């Protein structure tokens, strides 16, 4: 609060790998260490930074995966399990948060603001090709035609509600479709008791686990499901983790994924 900065005092270069949309961190981007470098995992997040925070040094690096092996050690000494020895057919690693919990972010707002964010969410669900940036600018300029870029940037953080809600909306749709189709899906993460579907018995919940446990179970799975968290020109580490640990990666796509992979050859999209 007094302006003193440990990193500047120590002369340390700070490299921050941001794995969410930068709008989640707008408040911190206004008071950065002198020698600050930011890594983003989506090219569109780079565009956001260059537009709204042009003084910040930003770089694109895709989120990396981690390889285990047959004995589930981080040090590679054996190949991963062949398909015929993998006990899990389909796995999903990650959490699920239902809308009624996310909605608490809006509880202290006036009704006009609540209506605005709910309308924006509905619009994004109906137009899933839009990025959160495009949607936000579209909705805000509709309300405030003369809004400046500075004002637009200041209005972005509350759109976190829309970003999270649409992510979990589609996550639920995919998991519900699989479960109701009779496919047993092993989930490693919290919140799946909230999934609304006709056949919840097909969602085998293992609860919240750490990252190494997720890798361990992917290395024992035939198919690893990924639902992209609204990265339109990036990738999620679930895909690399799946590939590195011998599972078939089943995912929706993005511009960047289309550049890296070929459908039905090294990924199923």
PLM regions: where:
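Short acidic active-site motifs
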Residues: 3, 27, 212-213
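Alpha-helix-centered segments that form part of catalytic cores
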Residues: 138-181
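Glycosyltransferases and closely related glycan-assembly transferases
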Residues: 2-14, 180
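Catalytic binding pocket for nucleotide-activated donors in carbohydrate/polymer assembly enzymes
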Residues: 31-33, 47-56, 165, 190-269
